[in-house]
């Protein structure tokens, strides 16, 4: 069982998923691990990270979709510790393409004024 949470957000319209993804990685110490075109004008993004960070990022993503012109939030979910069987089958695992972003989110923050970039 993974210790990292997984969050998934689905929108109608690409601008909404783009706004959500950007807000999520800027707000929470999370890694964007996947993107799925779920159908005509429906898009899903998947984030991973600490449970509290995924919750913070998801809130920011939902808010960003609400602000994006013409976008609609379809659904979202947070799984605190997905079972390894779920990680093995569904496209939610970290991969080599996103590993450098994962490493940057796992570095400890020192002091409250440190930039999260």
Swiss-Prot record:
Entry-linked Pfam families: BMC
Keywords on record: Bacterial microcompartment, Carbon dioxide fixation, Carboxysome, Photosynthesis
Protein name: Carboxysome shell protein CcmK4
Cross-referenced SMART domains: BMC
Domain of life: Bacteria
Record comment regarding domains: The tight homohexamer forms a small pore which is positively charged.
GO BP annotations listed: carbon fixation; photosynthesis
């Amino acid at each position: 069982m993974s210790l990292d949470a997984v969050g998934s957000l689905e929108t109608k319209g690409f601008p909404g998923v783009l706004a959500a993804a950007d807000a999520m990685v800027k707000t929470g110490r999370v890694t964007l691990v996947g993107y799925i075109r779920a159908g005509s004008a429906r898009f899903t993004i998947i984030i991973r990270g600490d449970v509290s960070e995924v919750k913070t990022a998801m809130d920011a993503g939902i808010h960003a979709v609400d602000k994006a012109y013409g976008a609609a939030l379809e659904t979202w979910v947070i799984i605190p510790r997905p079972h390894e069987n779920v990680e093995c089958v569904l496209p939610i695992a970290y991969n080599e393409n996103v590993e450098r972003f994962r490493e940057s989110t796992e570095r400890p923050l020192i002091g409250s004024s440190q930039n999260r970039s």
